Regions:
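Bacterial N-terminal signal peptides that target proteins for export
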Residues: 1-7
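C-terminal motif of bacterial Sec signal peptides marking the signal peptidase cleavage site
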Residues: 15-19
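Lipid interaction determinants
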Residues: 21-95, 103-164
């Protein structure tokens, strides 16, 4: 029993010293926000119009100069959303300049889509984000027009980040 007690004492002493770890896990890094992923200069890949009443779609990319569409989503020095500008000669479905922000800066736990909010000082335009840049530098959002609360037409913009 004396040997068993000595082994137990040795084992518990060894565990006490090895239980304290001095491994440095690094410093805290803030999570990547949707604003960080979405900010930048985006050029159009395609624009689709959807008739919400009967789900018919039409490609508008090569019509009405949509292929000239560019949106710049700028950040301030702290990395927060700041201003935006829209360039090109496509029809003005969006405001041409103002401020932007996300309705929620992270992926939502209830799987509802995030909204990109454009404010030109007069009104706020909400764009439903349908694809977020990741491995591919593709951003997609949908602008939905409504009358009496009912959607009647939507425009889906598929964009690629411009080369700097």
């Amino acid at each position: 029993t004396g040997n068993l007690f000595a082994i137990g004492l040795l084992f518990s002493t060894a565990m006490a010293f090895t239980g304290c770890s001095t491994v440095d896990d690094g410093s805290y890094t803030a999570p990547i926000t949707l604003s960080e992923k979405i900010s930048g200069k985006w050029v159009v890949n395609s624009v689709m119009q959807t008739d919400e009443a009967n789900a018919r779609t039409k490609t508008l990319t090569d019509l009405l100069d949509f292929d000239t569409f560019v949106i710049n989503l700028n950040q301030d020095e702290a990395g927060n959303p700041s201003t935006f500008t829209v360039e090109g000669s496509a029809p003005l479905l969006l405001p041409t300049s103002g401020t932007w922000k996300m309705d929620y800066n992270f992926t939502k736990s209830d799987n509802t889509p995030s909204r990109l909010l454009l404010n030109d000082g007069k009104a706020e335009t909400a764009l439903t984000v349908t694809a977020v840049p990741g491995n591919t530098k593709t951003l997609e959002y949908r602008l939905t027009r409504k009358t009496n609360g009912q959607p009647f037409v939507s425009y889906t913009y598929n964009l690629t980040q411009a080369v700097k």
